[in-house]
Structures are given as C-alpha cells and as structure tokens.
Amino acid sequence: MNWNQIIFISLIATVLILAIANEAESAAVRTDKSDIKREDGENMKKRIFMQESEATAFLKRRGRRSTKSKDEVNAENRQRLAADERRREYYEEQRNEFENYVEEERDEQQERNREKTEQWREYHYDGLYPSYQYNRHHI
C-alpha cells in the first residue's frame, strides 16, 4: 500500500469515529438539556460558595495575623495544661517505680551482706565472746 492510501484510510476512520461519538450521549457530559444544566449550576454555586459577609468573617477569624479569640486561647491553654499534667504524672510514676526498684535492690544487697557476715562469724568463731582475735593481750 501507498503512504497516501494509509493516511487517507486513517483520516476516514477518524472522521467516522468522531461523527458517531458526537451523536452519542456521554455519561460524563450531556450535550442537550442546557436549561437543566444552568439550574444545576446555580444550585451547585449556592452549595459551594458562601456569602461574601460570611467569607470575610471567616477569614478575619482564621487569618494568620489576626488575634485569636479568648475562647480559642483558653481552649489551647487547657489542652496544654492537661498535656503537662499527664506528662508530669507519667514521669512521677516512672520515678516512683525506679525508686522502689532501687530500694528493693539495696535491701537485697544488705541482706546478702548480713548473711555473708554471719556465715563468716560462724565459721571463724573460736568459742570466746567476743572472738579470740579481739581478746588478745599483748605483753
């Protein structure tokens, strides 16, 4: 086939597809009933856009440089104080648990030392009280 014939056939196929697609009603966009589209558009505008006074009031309240209301400041402070209290309680609980652990370890260590000392004294006891080593009289 010649290049001219291939281009001609592809153009005819493209025109045919466009003609069929133009008459078919698409699911996304309707080609007729334009008055319904206008009414839907007005309803959509009312649902999407707010009145100018409401918009300016919203932007004044929420602007970056505008001051916060007392209620907003108080709410933020309450949240901050509650978070500080939770953090303080958590660290206090952790500190108490560690102190209890250290106290138990010290008690166990003291008990082991006392037992070792008693065993040493029993093993080295010579029948005298206090032991013979401390009762020597050097001449």
From Swiss-Prot:
Modification note: Proteolytically cleaved by a furin-like convertase to generate a persistent C-terminal fragment found in almost the entire cartilage matrix, and affecting osteoblast differentiation. Sulfated on tyrosine residues.
Gene Ontology cellular-component annotations: extracellular matrix; extracellular region
4-carboxyglutamate PTM sites in chain numbering: 72, 76, 85, 89, 92-93, 97, 99, 103-105, 108, 111, 115, 118, 122
Residue ranges listed under propeptide: 27-65
Region of interest (Disordered), residue spans: 60-117
UniProt key word Hydrolase: no
Localization terms from the record: Secreted, Extracellular space, Extracellular matrix
Tissues expressing the protein: Detected in all tissues tested: heart, liver, kidney, muscle, gonads, brain, ganoid plate, anterior kidney, spleen, spine, cleithrum, head plate, operculum, skull, mandibula, branchial arches, anterior vertebra, and posterior vertebra. Expression is highest in the cartilaginous tissues (skull, mandibula, branchial arches, anterior vertebra and posterior vertebra), with the highest levels found in posterior vertebra. Found in mature and immature chondrocytes within the vertebra and mandibula, and in the chordoblast layer of the notochord in vertebra.
GO biological process: one example: regulation of osteoblast differentiation
Residues making up the signal peptide according to the UniProt record: 1-26
Main location: secreted
UniProt keyword annotation of NADP present: no
Alphabetical keyword list: Coiled coil, Extracellular matrix, Gamma-carboxyglutamic acid, Secreted, Signal, Sulfation
InterPro entries: UCMA
Parts forming coiled coils: 70-123
Segments of skewed composition (Basic and acidic residues): 68-98
Biological role stated in the UniProt entry: May be involved in the negative control of osteogenic differentiation of osteochondrogenic precursor cells in peripheral zones of fetal cartilage and at the cartilage-bone interface.
Protein family membership: Belongs to the UCMA family.
Record PANTHER family: UNIQUE CARTILAGE MATRIX-ASSOCIATED PROTEIN (PTHR28647:SF2)
Listed name of the protein: Unique cartilage matrix-associated protein
Organism expressing this protein natively: Acipenser naccarii (Adriatic sturgeon)
Gene that this sequence comes from: ucma
